[in-house]
């Protein structure tokens, strides 16, 4: 079985590095881009992720409330989880209701568990 490609959309290189390390240690094949425009270019180059982890406040999404739809348009069928330091009450005022959301700072085990759960939601995946 090949490693699942997990796309990380994150503008903070330190967080991206940590997430990349955790996913690689868990046996996945992480790929990192800094914003939605780079994710679009990555897709246009013929890449397809098994799942996407994205920071909520990344450039090129049209706003945090539009990020889930923007990512879904680029990667149809790929499950998405958001990562953010924005508190829950602030997310509500931004119009963000997408789940799952991993709140920063997060435990590394929570990240690994989230990715496992995301991969289990892919079409054609048996549980």
Predicted regions and their residues:
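Conserved acidic carboxylate
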Residues: 10
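Conserved phosphotransfer cores of two-component systems
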Residues: 44-47, 71-77, 90, 94
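Acidic, metal-coordinating helix/loop segments flanking the phosphotransfer/catalytic sites
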Residues: 32-51, 91
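Two-component/phosphorelay signaling modules centered on CheY-like receiver
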Residues: 13-31
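C-terminal output helix
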Residues: 106-118, 123
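Hydrophobic/aromatic residues positioned on beta-strands within the core alpha/beta folds
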Residues: 83-84
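Conserved phosphotransfer microenvironments
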Residues: 55-72
């Amino acid at each position: 079985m090949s490693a699942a490609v997990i796309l990380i959309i994150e503008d903070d290189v330190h967080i991206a590095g940590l997430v990349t390390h955790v996913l690689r240690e868990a046996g996945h094949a992480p790929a990192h881009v800094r914003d939605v425009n780079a994710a679009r270019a990555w897709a246009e180059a013929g890449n397809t992720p098994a799942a996407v982890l994205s920071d909520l406040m990344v450039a090129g999404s049209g706003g945090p409330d539009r990020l889930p739809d923007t990512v879904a348009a680029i990667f149809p069928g790929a499950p998405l989880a958001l990562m953010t330091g924005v508190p829950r009450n602030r997310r509500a005022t931004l119009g963000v209701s997408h789940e799952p959301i991993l709140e920063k700072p997060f435990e590394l085990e929570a990240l690994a568990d989230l990715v496992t759960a995301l991969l289990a939601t892919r079409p054609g995946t048996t549980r």
